[in-house]
Amino acid sequence: TDLLASRHIGINEQDTTVMLRKIGVDSLDELIEKTIPANIRLKEPLALNAPLTEYEFGKHIAELAGKNKLYTTYIGMGWYNTITPAVIQRNVFENPVWYTSYTPYQTEVSQGRLEALMNFQTAICDLTAMPLANCSLLDEATAAAEAVSMMYALRSRAQQKAGANVVFVDENIFPQTLAVMTTRAVPQGIELRVGKYKEFEPSQEVFACVLQYPNSNGSVEDYTEFTEKAHAADCKVAVAADILSLALLTPPGEWGADIVFGTTQRLGTPMFYGGPSAGYFATRDEYKRNMPGRIIGWSKDKYGKLCYRMALQTREQHIKREKATSNICTAQALLATMAGFYAVYHGQEGITTIASRIHSITVFLDKQLKKFGYTQVNAQYFDTLRFELPEHVSAQQIRTIALSKEVNLRYFENGNVGFSIDETTDVAAANVLLSIFAIAAGKDYQKVDDIPEKSNIDKTVKRTTPFLTHEVFNKYHTETEMMRYIKRLDRKDISLAQSMISLGSCTMKLNAAAEMLPLSRPEFMGMHPLVPEDQAEGYRELINNLSEDLKIITGFAGVSLQPNSGAAGEYTGLRVIRAYLESIGQGHRNKILIPASAHGTNPASAIQAGFITVTCACDEQGNVDMDDLCAKAEENKEELAALMITCPSTHGIFETEIKDICHIIHACGAQVYMDGANMNAQVGLTNPGFIGADVCHLNLHKTFASPHGGGGPGVGPICVAEHLVPFLPGHGIFGNAQNQVSSAPFGSAGILPITYGYIRMMGTEGLTMATKIAILNANYLAACLKDTYGIVYRGANGFVGHEMILECRKVHEETGISENDIAKRLMDYGYHAPTLSFPVHGTLMIEPTESESLAELDNFVDVMLNIWQEIQEVKNGEADKDDNVLINAPHPEYEIVSDRWEHPYTREKAAYPIESVRENKFWINVARVDNTLGDRKLLPTRYGTFE
């Protein structure tokens, strides 16, 4: 019982027998044989290591963590030591209510995290002095790339006519940001022109500028005149700003920036060897429809109660597909939530104190090191100093002394040395820094006992305006109040801690505690991504081991863990394909074939990667229409770069002709990209390499047990065949910026221990059984619900894969009750809705995963059948078609206990429709939310009002 598989998989042998009988097969193997085509079944089990028990894995991960050397690091460059308030670490980061919830599409059961994300947006708007912010992007570098794409889309008619395609980038931008911007700009035909901002001259071809504030050297420049000059030439200005510095520096919004972006890692998020942390993005209100990422806004429920919702979703990939403003889907919701709570806990005074303390220590060290003969090059700075060394001192000398004291500094290519002070730097640490530079220069130094409050920030760049003035940032500064505020919010949300979340295509499985615990180890939390390799041996070993495991599971030869989400993985895979085609003289191939049933990120990613999409039809059984595929492949043969396909398809079925499909595409000289969103039906039974794909991405936050976090963090690694390995993403700081897609070399390295633990503790047998049970559970639900709702698509032998689509269109025709009404009614029973109207409009897609027990599956069936009865009551005239439990759902607590009750059905029917609800009632906070109000008037901060 100490093996994870017995805890992770919710179904035992006895349950399996009962379920197989209901499905109508004699054995689990028979079910699998009838579900997965024989020609793609693996002949041998996966050659993974034997599984570790939870206890053994705990010891193993402790050994790996012990190989990481946690030196005091002042490298900076976008990553800094922080202090995560314990109340946030324990009650948010380590709390399954926060980390197991899904993206808040279902507004009424997401009010807690919507408020937390609204706090984040408000903090960003206040600190940047911009009117609009989204609720996170993947990291600073991808935010920069998104800014460039957005400004390109916003070009004036005259600029478009003139073919303006140049972005001016100041040379003192972080190198990793420039590398990712380059990756993303090239396929869109955008040229990045790097130079000195003081020498910038506008010209007809330049449509935008990107600046860093403070810049990469740490210098704080006054960009006011530059911005005026750019605007006079109709150039937009985007600024990468250190969010903590804006407590002391004039915010870019006050000197005219059009976009302000960056990372909120400094707001209490550990460095995690590079990620995850929440990127931020703020802009002007008039650009809201071009803005990437999710935006939280105010709305009202049907009784007029104020509430939150995700606004302007029609911009996003799941609706707009190839016309979307961005391919982003999963972002960094959990980290944005934590950064928002950090702002709530500290408020303006606390954040200003932290920033001032950092700055004072920096001023003190600047003055002291000048006495030792060092020349500091930044006239104005916040936390970062860059020194020219005295003639008799070398950077190597300083490095040797620093390493002997377990300190990492920043070493510039020209021999300069620098450092960035952070929230954790105290007097003792400052004394160590003093000693390093004094010893190198052969000077005496005096230890100090105290460092006075001092500022060298000139009034031209000094902040004078207040921020975080809303009461939420001024009420919760004691731990008791903060703990209760967090609890008050988490009670409003459905997560896996409450009940099954059956979202199709999302794989909401168990995120086991044994997998999650290592994330809180200081050796994993406190590691800067640019430390010397010998200090990160534990991380490197974990990354190598995990990469080998993923190669075995997918049947591929190479892996990149850099992409921070599934959509980022899609983009990366397509960039790799493009690079390969260019290398063999086939760079003219620019078309991607995509089935009509594909996830919206597929066409959006293809467009971002500079391709043209060609849609291929599906037949009545939900398979790719082979005639249409052959015709489109032949028609576009010379220009075809790749096919993007999901297996099993988004319709939840294994296509019998998948191998033939791969062969047809390869015969055209093109590549096959497999979307790994449905990998939970493949692991151990088949794999993309065996099927015939060339590249696939995985969603570690689906198949491989990493949590969804309410909308991120995710990891979207790509796995590739041998011929594509040379084109995998590199990292500029390590000398190879080819196809770089994330700020950090290994993307969100900090959450890789989860998937590593899942694979190491499940082993071949456990992983394979998990896949079989996921398929069993989906077929069991299909068998239980087929005679009422009906199942839209089935495979060749009448079975579904790991998910199935529930037919709701006939119900709507006969009764007016929609799939949305059913989804909202499920909330009254304590369940999150399945996936609505994807991939087929007017349906619900259900994916139970392997983690649910038979008791939970049966309860869900009881609920769905009871809702079916409620639908029949409307159909038969027993219930009022204009006033019934379905169209009025969900029923919030305040309505149930109200003095007025004017519905023709009882309060009990509304709130306790079946007995099991009494044991685990989830009280909803708001009635059905008005979706149009919040879009007509977008209010993206806590200060918003409809009056």
PLM segments and residue spans:
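Short helix-loop-beta connector
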Residues: 130-131, 161, 555-557, 586-588
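Non-catalytic terminal extensions of PLP-dependent enzymes
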Residues: 1-22, 34-74, 83-99, 105-111, ...
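Flexible, glycine/proline-enriched loop segments at strand-loop-helix junctions
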Residues: 104-112, 132-136, 165-172, 212, ...
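Conserved PLP-enzyme active-site core in the AAT-like
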Residues: 112, 142-307, 369, 382, ...
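Conserved phosphate/anionic-ligand binding catalytic regions in large, soluble enzymes, centered on
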Residues: 269-282, 286-287, 331-335, 420, ...
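TRNA-binding/sensing appendages of the translation machinery
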Residues: 25-39, 257-262, 693-696
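A conserved hydrophobic secondary-structure block that centers on an alpha-helix together
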Residues: 123-144, 163, 167
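General small-molecule cofactor/ligand-binding pocket signal
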Residues: 133, 191-195, 377, 410, ...
